[in-house]
A protein has these predicted regions:
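Conserved active-site tyrosine of GNAT-family acetyltransferases
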Residues: 29, 33-34, 101, 126-129
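Vicinal oxygen chelate
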Residues: 2-18, 40-91, 95-125, 136-139
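Conserved beta-strand-loop-alpha-helix junction that forms the acyl-donor binding cleft
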Residues: 23-26, 116
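Short glycine-/small-residue motifs
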Residues: 131-134
């Protein structure tokens, strides 16, 4: 892209996204994401704590405490409303990740399956009802 005086103007490049998950208890959520899903706590903020972030590799999930339900009833599970979507690079990795979460006793909304478009996916249900999609590429 060029500007009037022949200057080149760089277009901003979006490099990542961070999902914000609504939770009831920041400590319980951090414990779930670290103990069950292999994330680490990047930070917890507030007194009492109401905001935090967990990370694993290049994935970041923000956790925000809310005092009342954000969604009505079981609409998230009924309508399969995802709170976050995380990807891995290979079919071997998605299978390995699924098996490690299964061994850790993680509750699944959907077990590992091949989607009609070829991707391999599974969905984890966290203690607050957030649906976290994990996806790998087609074969």
């Amino acid at each position: 892209m060029t500007h009037e005086a022949g200057q080149t103007v760089l277009c901003p490049v979006l490099s990542s996204t961070e999902a914000q998950l609504f939770v009831a208890d920041i400590k319980a959520s951090c414990d779930f994401y670290t103990d069950k899903l292999g994330f680490t706590v990047a930070f917890v903020y507030g007194d009492p704590p109401y905001y935090g972030q967990v990370t694993r590799d290049h994935a970041r999930l923000n956790l925000r405490v809310v005092g009342e339900p954000v969604f009505v009833g079981d609409i998230r599970e009924r309508e399969h409303l995802l709170s976050a979507s995380l990807t891995v690079a290979s079919t071997d990795e998605i299978k390995q990740l699924f098996l490690s979460y299964q061994a850790a006793g993680v509750r699944f909304h959907q077990t590992l399956k091949k989607e009609p478009w070829g991707a391999r996916t599974f969905i984890v249900l966290d203690p607050d009802g957030n649906l976290i999609l994990f996806a790998g590429p087609a074969d």
